[in-house]
Each structure stands twice: as C-alpha cells, then as structure tokens.
Amino acid sequence: MDIIYNPVLGGVVEGEWPNVHRNYVPTLCMHCKNPECVPCCPTGASQQDPDGVVWVDYKKCMGCKVCVNACPYGMRDTSHMVRRFDEYVRKCTFCKERREMEPDKDPYCVQTCHQKARIFGDIDDPNSAISRLINRSDTFRLLEELGTDPQIYYIPALGGKR
C-alpha cells in the first residue's frame, strides 16, 4: 500500500469564464505544538521531538488507529509492512531520519518542489526566512481554531484568496 503524505485539497475555483483559475492546497501533517494524536497513543509510539516534529516509533506502534482518529487533519494512515503482517501508523515526519543523518538537508518534499513553493526552517528564529514569511499578514493555518497550534503555514497564491 502506498501512502501519500501530501494529499492536495481540491482547491478553490476563482474568477469567471474565461478567466477562471483554481488554487490547490497541498496538505501534510501540521506538526502541531499541541497535537491531539500524541497523548492519546496507548503505547507511546506517537511522539514529538524537541524540535516539534511529530513522528511514530514503528517498533512501538500496535496499529490500533487511536491516533488516526484523533488527528483533526486526517494526516495519518495505516500501512501493511512488507516484513510484518500487522498494520502500523504512518505519517509525514519531515524526513526525520534523513535530517538526523544530514542535519543541513531539507525534507524531500521541499527539495523536490519544482516551483519552490515549500520552505522549511526554524520558525523560532525571528531572522530566518521562514519566520519573515510567516509574519506576513496574509499567511494562514488550517483549522487553527481547534487549538492544536499547527506549525504549517500557508501563503495565498498571488492574486488568490485563502
């Protein structure tokens, strides 16, 4: 089973014929500061590292899907492992294993984005490029009203709306 870590919301259609365009919204794990998926895990497999990255320890995961149901963004899924017959939960980890080996490397989704629409960095550093972009007045976060404090920010497309 293939897992899609960055599904795209259908987008918002704007304009009138013949000047119609659609804005697409790629989604991924929001790596919330207050994730609902971490404290509910009965085995402690769902974790959050000191940098705020939410991840799953596959060795501890029993595939109960409690965290799948707890995620308000629907960004967790289960997958059959090749070497095991049971299921475990998978999700975007910002390529945690890769960044542990190569700390100066961005996650693959950032590295391979042809339009350079994805930016990864330290949002706690006020001088970082990502912090400067976040401080723009037009950025927004999905389902911010839930209180999970999502750490993925969106900048509307030029001329686009939220």
Please report, for each region that a protein language model flagged, where it lies by residue.
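Non-ligating segments of multi-cofactor redox enzymes
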Residues: 1-162
